[in-house]
């Protein structure tokens, strides 16, 4: 994997990715691709990016040895990359800072975004306030009900939250609506996509902004334990936190990479969001080609996960490619496993993780006991769980 290079000039990662959009969007995406290419080669752009990551987001985020949890499980040592400590409480802001700087460079006055759990919506509203832009966030009506605290946060930050009533009223539908809006107002509007998916150049761009996670982790693990972890694990919905951790490790062949999809009620039921693990065929959604949960007529299937942020029927194209070339292993954690991991991290480490991140913790909980005490698992703790306490309380039958 030393010579891993993706995507190609057409935005493909192997057979995944690309640009599958209506004619009306082609000029906007071309303008974006050109602007990003120029920014990518401009040291001043990265200087501004690093400045905001340090002084505004509070990076670098630390790596932390979850010693009590490791001892309780008996086996591998579990370390956490603490993305939950970023401003706004998740990894999402790494990407929104980058895209907002690009929007500013392109002279756009308005940003729009889609959101599932509300984390990307909050991160987009945050950077819009930071850079003086107006912001509209598209959110499925069902997700609005699940994530009221984040909806209020976005409004506090000055954003307009647009409820999407069509389809399954979740992330997929919010993304459809945001893309429609972008077509209508492409002149003054920049669309901040929140995950490593969508039409080219988004998957590459989001990955590049999120790679700060893996780049920091490599240096930090070297300093902390004198070597790299045996396994690096992250949850995968669209997959931006995971690609940010994995990409810098692709060339490190002795580091096993594990992506954890949302197993929901089980991949043998219709209620999950695990396109790779469930063996979903390739399809096109939201402007890119990738593994996609669909029926025999190519209709996109409904999904289910206890975490709104993993509740997506597709997966970022680079993840599909990394699965194809067997560099990353993809597996699932079910709702109940994620909830158990959530409880364990709260009780043993005093850290309330996001339900999304709890899926990655669940893999460590399950696998650490099978490994040696001298082995190390690095978990990307992609976000904090304040936004999920209502969901968890409801599942436990507790009224807040």
From Swiss-Prot:
**Pathways per UniProt:** Amino-acid biosynthesis; L-tryptophan biosynthesis; L-tryptophan from chorismate: step 5/5
Give the required cofactors. pyridoxal 5'-phosphate
Q: Which reaction does it catalyse?
A: (1S,2R)-1-C-(indol-3-yl)glycerol 3-phosphate + L-serine = D-glyceraldehyde 3-phosphate + L-tryptophan + H2O
* Molecular function terms, GO-annotated: tryptophan synthase activity
Name the NCBIfam families for this protein.
trpB
Subunit info here reads:
Tetramer of two alpha and two beta chains.
Q: Which family does it belong to?
A: Belongs to the TrpB family.
Functionally, this protein is described as follows: The beta subunit is responsible for the synthesis of L-tryptophan from indole and L-serine.
Residue spans making up a coiled coil are none
Q: Any idea which residues bear N6-(pyridoxal phosphate)lysine here?
A: 92
Name by which UniProt lists this protein? Tryptophan synthase beta chain
Supply the alphabetized keyword list: Amino-acid biosynthesis, Aromatic amino acid biosynthesis, Lyase, Pyridoxal phosphate, Tryptophan biosynthesis
- Any one cellular-component term (Gene Ontology): cytoplasm
From which organism does this entry originate?
Neisseria meningitidis serogroup C / serotype 2a (strain ATCC 700532 / DSM 15464 / FAM18)
EC number in record: 4.2.1.20
Keyword presence, Aminoacyl-tRNA synthetase: no
InterPro entries according to UniProt: Trp_synth_b_CS, Trp_synth_beta, Trp_synth_beta/beta-like, TrpB-like_PALP, TrpB-like_PALP_sf
């Amino acid at each position: 994997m030393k010579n891993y290079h993706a995507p190609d000039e057409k935005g493909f990662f192997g057979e995944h990715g690309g640009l599958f959009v209506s004619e009306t969007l082609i000029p906007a995406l071309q303008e974006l691709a050109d602007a990003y290419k120029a920014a990518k080669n401009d040291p001043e752009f990265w200087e501004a990016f690093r400045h905001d990551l340090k002084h505004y987001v509070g990076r670098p985020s630390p790596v932390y040895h979850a010693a009590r949890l490791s001892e309780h499980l008996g086996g591998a040592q579990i370390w956490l990359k603490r993305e939950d400590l970023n401003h706004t409480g998740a990894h999402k802001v790494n990407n929104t800072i980058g895209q907002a700087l690009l929007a500013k460079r392109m002279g756009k006055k308005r940003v729009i975004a889609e959101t599932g759990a509300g984390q990307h919506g909050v991160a987009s509203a945050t950077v819009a306030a930071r850079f003086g832009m107006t912001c509209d966030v598209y959110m499925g009506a069902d997700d609005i009900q699940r994530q009221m605290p984040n909806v209020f946060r976005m409004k506090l930050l000055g954003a307009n939250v647009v409820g999407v009533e069509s389809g399954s009223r979740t992330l997929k539908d919010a993304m459809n609506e945001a893309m429609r809006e972008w077509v209508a107002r492409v002149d003054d509007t920049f669309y901040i996509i929140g995950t490593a998916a969508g039409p080219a150049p988004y998957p590459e761009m989001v990955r590049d902004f999120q790679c700060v996670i893996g780049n920091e982790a490599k240096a930090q693990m070297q300093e902390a334990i004198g070597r790299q972890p045996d396994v690096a694990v992250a949850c995968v919905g669209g997959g931006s936190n995971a690609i940010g951790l994995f990409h810098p490790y692709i060339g490190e062949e002795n580091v096993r990479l594990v992506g954890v999809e949302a197993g929901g009620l089980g991949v043998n039921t219709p209620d999950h969001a695990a396109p790779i693990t469930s063996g979903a065929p390739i399809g096109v959604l939201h402007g890119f080609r990738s593994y996609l949960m669909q029926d025999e007529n190519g209709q996109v299937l409904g999904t289910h996960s206890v975490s709104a942020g993993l509740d997506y029927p597709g997966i970022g194209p680079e993840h599909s490619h990394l699965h194809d070339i067997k560099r990353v292993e993809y597996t699932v954690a079910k709702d109940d496993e994620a909830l158990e991991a959530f409880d364990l991290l709260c009780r043993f480490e005093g850290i309330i993780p996001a339900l999304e991140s709890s899926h990655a913790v669940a893999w460590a909980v399950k696998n650490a006991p099978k490994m040696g005490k001298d082995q190390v698992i690095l978990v990307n703790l992609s976000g904090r769980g304040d936004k999920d306490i209502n969901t968890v309380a409801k599942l436990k039958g507790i009224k807040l």
